[in-house]
UniProtKB/Swiss-Prot annotation:
InterPro entries: Ribosomal_uL13, Ribosomal_uL13_bac-type, Ribosomal_uL13_CS, Ribosomal_uL13_sf. GO terms for biological process: negative regulation of translation; translation. This protein is one of the early assembly proteins of the 50S ribosomal subunit, although it is not seen to bind rRNA by itself. It is important during the early stages of 50S assembly. It comes from the Bacteria. This is Large ribosomal subunit protein uL13. Keywords: Ribonucleoprotein, Ribosomal protein. The gene is rplM. GO terms for cellular component: cytosolic large ribosomal subunit; ribosome. The lineage of its organism: Bacteria, Pseudomonadati, Campylobacterota, Epsilonproteobacteria, Campylobacterales. GO terms for molecular function: mRNA binding; structural constituent of ribosome. Gene3D superfamilies: Ribosomal protein L13 (3.90.1180.10). Part of the 50S ribosomal subunit. It holds the Pfam family Ribosomal_L13. It comes from Helicobacter pylori (strain ATCC 700392 / 26695). Belongs to the universal ribosomal protein uL13 family. Coiled coil: none annotated.
């Protein structure tokens, strides 16, 4: 019989990922897999069985091609003429946390379960983070 995961049986780990000199898309894919729990043998789609993920050195990630200048992110408040855009370079300098959340959110389910998963993602610009107590028992990847 196939064993399904129960909410009470899940033990969540804290995984620290260093984004320095890693390709952004591949890093985001790895984060999404860890948040969903697809790396576990008892993965169940309707249960949040993923780990907590801490990303350090978020603004030192690499992009291929001319994405830093060409890729744009748009926001709209709902009023006429209020469309604003920022390039990837501006987003990376001003708010790398938001950039990671936007990219990972696109790979997670668009449900309440997806919102619970994205709350387990912690992104920090440099190598200092307040989660050393949770992650001290393991080495950083």
């Amino acid at each position: 019989m196939t064993k399904t995961a129960k909410v009470n049986d899940i033990v969540r780990d804290w995984v620290v990922l260093d984004a320095k000199d890693k390709v952004f898309g591949r890093l985001i894919t790895e984060i999404a897999v860890l948040l969903r729990g697809k790396h576990r043998p008892f993965y169940t789609p309707n249960v949040d069985c993923g780990d907590f993920v801490v990303v350090i050195n978020a603004n030192k990630v690499k992009f291929s091609g001319m994405k830093l200048e060409d890729k744009e992110y748009f926001t709209h408040s709902g009023y006429f003429g209020s469309t604003k855009s920022k390039t990837l370079q501006e987003m990376l300098e001003k708010a790398p946390e938001k950039l990671y959340h936007l990219a990972v959110r696109g790979m997670l389910p668009k449900t309440k379960l997806g919102k619970a998963m994205i709350k387990k993602l912690k992104v920090y610009r440099d190598d200092k983070h307040p989660h050393t107590a949770q992650t001290s028992k393991k080495d950083a990847k």
